[in-house]
């Protein structure tokens, strides 16, 4: 009886929720008071041509820091589940010529593309999260081609820690000038210029390096766990 009543209760509650929402919210007339203010003032106030960057780092930068904390917690939990990285299996053969040559060719390209996406995040769509994923891919591909050559987890941890410290320090510096935490400092500059938007490019660089180091370490740990598992 309870098994049958559960889906019915869920469906009834969901239908009631939809009814309340449709009855209270006017259809076709969304309330965008905050959005209009951001669209009208972000470019002149923050100096970022990419309005999304203004929202992510300036208007709700504390949420972005929370997202970084969630990513750190997820990577830490995954690392604990996988266990301490053991010694890489030296007997495991490297990939074929095409895989090795492709990884060697793509590594510098991915580094350049990743840094470009990060450093231009305040000008064009992209930013630290997207560029960080590209940077992580650049360091994971060589591991897939040559399993015996694994980047140092200690070096990745240092980069991750320093990037996080720079993000928090940049945000805390605003407190010294009697501003809110993570308020953009420095001059907004000329809209559309590479050196503009105050400290937002610094924050995005910290985000990109932190995301790249965390994701690269996690994916490389996955490859190590697969190599250590019995065949």
Residue spans for each PLM region:
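Alpha-helical transmembrane segments and their helix-start/interface "positive-inside/aromatic belt" motifs
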Residues: 1-16, 152-164
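Interfacial/capping segments of alpha-helical transmembrane domains
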Residues: 23-45, 182
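Short aromatic-rich membrane-water interface segments that cap or initiate transmembrane helices
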Residues: 40-47, 52-65, 190-205
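Hydrophobic cores of alpha-helical transmembrane segments in multi-pass inner/ER membrane proteins
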Residues: 70-79, 136-139, 143, 203-218
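Cytoplasmic juxtamembrane regions at transmembrane-helix boundaries
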Residues: 75-101, 225-231
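Membrane-interface helix caps and helix-loop-helix hairpins in membrane proteins
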Residues: 118-127
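Structural signature of hydrophobic alpha-helical transmembrane segments
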Residues: 126-135
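A structural-propensity feature for long, helix-poor, extended segments
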Residues: 156-186
